[in-house]
Amino acid sequence: YGKRRHPKKLTPLAYKQFIPNVAEKTLGASGRYEGKITRNSERFKELTPNYNPDIIFKDEENTVMNQWPGVKLRVTEGWDEDGHHFEESLHYEGRAVDITTSDRDKSKYGTLSRLAVEAGF
């Protein structure tokens, strides 16, 4: 009580590293697949759109901005219906997101992945 926590050192994730260390569609990573959501399904109404061009990632601590001033998070894919993912992809349920940085600097991706894990994704 009353003590300030020291920020822990962020270790970037390695290419193709998962947290937890299991594939996206396994029960341990994301729970049971509930079925594809289409525009005509009842569950489509449960999806929450985000139209804000500046705030596209809930980041109460401004971790992306603090890590790289002037750089924004860039969502390249969220909910999808195009059929370009594997059949039980969480993109079809609105439970997966692909992200990068606005400057598209691949050297930042490991740290960006770690920030996403720390944020609860």
Swiss-Prot record:
Binding, Ca(2+) 2: E61, E77, D80, D82
Keyword Calcium among UniProt keywords: yes
Gene name tied to this protein: shh
Annotated protein name in UniProt: Sonic hedgehog protein
Keywords on record: Autocatalytic cleavage, Calcium, Cell membrane, Developmental protein, Hydrolase, Lipoprotein, Membrane, Metal-binding, Palmitate, Protease, Secreted, Zinc
Post-translational modification comment from the UniProt entry: The C-terminal domain displays an autoproteolysis activity and a cholesterol transferase activity. Both activities result in the cleavage of the full-length protein and covalent attachment of a cholesterol moiety to the C-terminal of the newly generated N-terminal fragment (N-product). The N-product is the active species in both local and long-range signaling, whereas the C-product has no signaling activity.
Main location: secreted
Coiled coil: none
Highest taxon, organism lineage: Eukaryota
Annotated binding of Zn(2+), by residue: H91, D98
Positions with a binding annotation for Ca(2+) 1: E60, E61, T76, E77
Keyword Repeat: no
Domain notes: The sonic hedgehog protein N-product binds calcium and zinc ions; this stabilizes the protein fold and is essential for protein-protein interactions mediated by this domain.
Record's subunit section: N-product is active as a multimer.
InterPro entries: Hedgehog, Hedgehog_sig/DD-Pept_Zn-bd_sf, Hedgehog_Signaling, Hedgehog_signalling_dom
